[in-house]
Amino acid sequence: MSYELKICLEPVGFVKTDAVGHEVRDKKVISQIVFREELTEALEGIEEFSHLFILFWLNEISDQGRKTMKVHPRGRSDMPLLGIFATRTPHRPNPIGLTRVKLLNVEGNIITVQGLDAFDGTPVLDMKPFDRWDTAEDFKVPEWWLKLDTERTNKKE
């Protein structure tokens, strides 16, 4: 098996948002995805779903960031040093983002969503509807993840 395979992707659209910096992490942020005109008919029926998965290219990650192999989750030194595949860091060999968003509106080749943690101009690679099969009933996470989740929940309250 050769690991030299090169994959060339063409964005299906681009993110349009006024959010900047850490604001994009706010799950209340409203964004638009402007799809290529010739893909408009591919959106037919998507309005029947409440939530979607958006796959996007993290184009602001540097070449050095793509070489990162270990990180502390959320950049916090009080968290364990882990391999990047055990975290949700954007620094990875193939900087692909994946976010579940709430679909608010579809108009022509533009969809409006809530909760997309991507910057203005981010290339969108694909979109898929979210359904009940995408929820695991018996998942587990490590202790450090539970700590971060508890802190995030307490911060919201």
Language-model segments: residues:
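Glycine-rich, low-complexity intrinsically disordered segments
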Residues: 1-100, 104-157
